[in-house]
């Protein structure tokens, strides 16, 4: 399940979502009818992220739907205002399709409010959406820094997901200290950046994890691309896109509300299944997936395990759950790269026989596949 870390004083406790009903006690109550959330988007994007990176539409749509379902008013802003462009995304994902069908929401996205024209006192919460564009225009926007600082001083919940915490890096409190100093938080990790941020990372002003650590933030992270939300008082941060719903519901709780019941999406169910596997119940996770594979995003599970195995390198303790995750997806995926990834993991763990069997299966289906042939040579060397 989604991992959520709540900080209260100096003690740290980990809770499952079902135990978070008391989290609202960490925040000041607000008048329900007046609760308004400001969503901040990067305006950097061009050409669906091809020539300049933008924001992540998935991180916008999933949070927006949570906010609206819980009766919160929503406004959207960007550093310069006007239309903003997301990176490439799947419009057929149910949460994206639902937002795209909302005419009022799309009108806001076509004419986002410029940050400089906003009053912090109008908002009970600020939510910063990620995407690699957030690493460029958000941390250099002084009006945004001032708005977040003033909103924090007014008692607002400040939240960000994935690369969104870049907007927090340069925020200063009234005494000149960084907002993040001494506070538990998370965001897109250096490990995740090394695998998924290569195109733009060389242009970043800094790596997000490094910047927040250097400014005194107490960094927290889960394994690669696993959902992870950190709550420290009124500061709520999420590690990656799969933390979006957890962040949004933490904001709802922070405003004194109990999130309405909802059916988890396919990606959420898939991540929860992987968490179950990583918690020691690989057999139970496999049985659950076998009962209804269509309710899960099997390709996501396979890809997650593949990249976790790649990131594990020589860390065999990290490699084993990555291998189990790939094997969870393998019966439902015909992708030869996944089977080769599993073979590679077995080889690294010392099981040459199993690795060889898997590679031969790939070569039987694709006799000329050079990558499989090269791996077989390594196994037999």
Tell me the role of every PLM-derived stretch.
Residues 1-13:
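N-terminal secretory signal peptides that target proteins for export/translocation
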Residues 6-7, 17, 350:
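Alpha-helical and His/Cys-centered functional microenvironments
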Residues 9-10, 23, 361:
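Detector for intrinsically disordered, low-structure N-terminal pre-sequences
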Residues 17-21, 25:
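Hydrophobic helical h-region of N-terminal Sec-dependent signal peptides
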Residues 28-29:
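N-terminal signal peptide c-region/cleavage motif recognized by signal peptidases
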Residues 34-153, 167-186, 191-203, 207-209, ...:
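Extended, subdomain-level signal for the structured scaffold at the beginning of enzyme domains
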Residues 158-165, 248:
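Short, thiol/selenol-centered motifs that function as redox-active sites or metal-ligating centers
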């Amino acid at each position: 399940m989604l991992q959520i870390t709540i900080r209260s004083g100096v003690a740290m406790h980990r809770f499952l979502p079902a135990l978070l009903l008391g989290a609202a006690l960490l925040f000041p109550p607000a008048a329900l009818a007046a609760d308004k959330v400001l969503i901040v988007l990067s305006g950097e994007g061009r050409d669906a992220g091809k020539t300049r990176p933008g924001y992540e539409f998935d991180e916008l749509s999933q949070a927006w739907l949570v906010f609206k379902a819980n009766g919160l008013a929503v406004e959207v802003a960007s550093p310069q205002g006007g239309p903003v462009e997301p990176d490439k995304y799947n419009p057929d994902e149910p949460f994206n399709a639902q937002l795209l069908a909302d005419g009022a929401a799309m009108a806001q996205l076509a004419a986002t409010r410029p940050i400089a024209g906003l009053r912090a006192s109008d908002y009970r919460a600020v939510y910063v959406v990620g995407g690699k564009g957030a690493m460029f225009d958000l941390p250099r926007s002084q009006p945004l820094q001032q708005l977040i600082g003033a909103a924090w001083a007014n008692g607002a919940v400040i939240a960000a997901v994935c690369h969104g915490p870049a907007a927090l890096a340069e925020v200063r409190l009234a005494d000149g200290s960084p907002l993040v100093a001494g506070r538990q938080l998370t965001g897109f990790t250096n490990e995740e950046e090394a695998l998924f941020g290569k195109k733009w990372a060389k242009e970043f002003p800094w790596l997000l994890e490094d910047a927040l650590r250097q400014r005194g933030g107490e960094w927290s992270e889960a394994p690669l691309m696993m959902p992870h939300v950190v709550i420290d008082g009124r500061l709520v941060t999420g590690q990656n896109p799969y933390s979006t719903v957890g962040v949004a519901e933490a904001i709802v709780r922070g405003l004194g509300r109990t999130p309405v019941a909802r059916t988890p999406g396919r990606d959420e169910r898939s991540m929860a299944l992987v968490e179950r596997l990583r918690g020691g119940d690989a057999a139970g996770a496999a049985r659950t997936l076998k009962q209804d594979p269509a309710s899960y995003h099997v390709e996501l599970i396979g890809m997650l395990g593949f990249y976790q195995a790649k990131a594990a390198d020589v860390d065999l303790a990290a490699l084993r759950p990555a291998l189990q995750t790939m094997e969870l997806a393998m019966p439902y995926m015909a992708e030869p790269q996944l089977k080769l990834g599993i073979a590679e993991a077995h080889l690294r763990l010392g099981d040459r026989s199993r690795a060889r069997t898997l590679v031969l299966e790939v070569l039987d289906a694709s006799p000329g596949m050079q990558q499989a042939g090269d791996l077989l040579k390594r196994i037999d060397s």
